[in-house]
Amino acid sequence: MLVRLLSIGDIGVLDGMMHIGDEAMFEALRDEMAMRDVGLVAVSSAPTESADRYGVPSVRNVGFRGLSRAAATERMRLVIDAAKRPSALETDDPAREVIDAVAGTDGVVVAGGGNLASRWSAHVFERATLAGIAGALGRPVVVTGQTLGPDLDPEDRAVLSPAFRAARLVGVRESASCALARELGVEARLGVDDASFLGDRDSDVDESGARRGVLVSLSLSLGDLRRPQAVARLARLIDEAAALTGEAVVFHAHFGPLDPGAPPRGDAILHDEVRERMSARSEVIPTGDPRAAARLARSSALLITGRYHPAVFAAPAGVPIVGLTSDDYTRIKQLGALAHWGQDGVAALGAADTDGTATLRRVWHDRAAISAAAEARMPANRAEASAWWDSVARG
């Protein structure tokens, strides 16, 4: 059993903005490792904030944002080389602290968050570099909770493949990611998202009450759809949901300000625009933290979401879900999250008020069967996830 791991996800609250999903995956990792007496050191965009939030030591990322591919490739080479020759880096280079942190731990975990696709190539370089540092220092690497691609160009595959092939374990969330991992030369474990059970066994959790409300969590990532068109279509879909279910509508931003009194930012901006176009009344719940977000999703009667982690939280509880997608990436993620629990209610954002309405009616009609399917799958999914965390802790 390992004693202390360094973990990189995509954490760190910057400018007062919380990203529920990314923080949730790290929080779940911290909880699972703590139950196995394994400590963590976090790699974060905001080390002081993350250290305070999670009660673990934190260091800053190596740093690849804004670099050209040539510059990123050279920086990766220099940093990995510096794992054995520290003098290769400037004295104030943040990579020095990362190298020291890896040297002071028993292994590295590449956690969920910062999905590995060419649209975010800085994440690819960051994680491949961390794996390279671990290899140079003789530390094992485990990869968990990943979505791969679907856009992963040959150059990024060449960066990522050696890191994946050197890892002792690789875990992904969707069958499409599993297939892409195989193309990279790795047989990956396919399982539920790492945050699927976040906080669901906390002592203050009470699931005895009836589920209430139409929960709406949208994303400002609209693909090729123009904003006014998206707002109009979403408003019609949500109005239909309110009329169909007879439930109150609640909006909850998964990317929004930590301060509940702050002006709307992130997803909350889109939420306000949609609310203005709706006929049904609605309320807003502040972004809050991952555990509160998970409880909210699990207690809802229906979820309409353009975000991924609301579905991750709600599906295990058997909440009927309408997942809205804007491209292949979001479609793969939504279908992947739902498939683990026997759901498939996904529609394109551009057809939210047509195909989305049909999906809404179907999942609401089938809500009893959806709940039963989740309940039937829970024991196996939970046991498999627990066994996976055991393997991660062993390295």
Model-found features: residue ranges?
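Active-site anion-handling motifs in enzyme catalytic cores
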Residues: 1-395
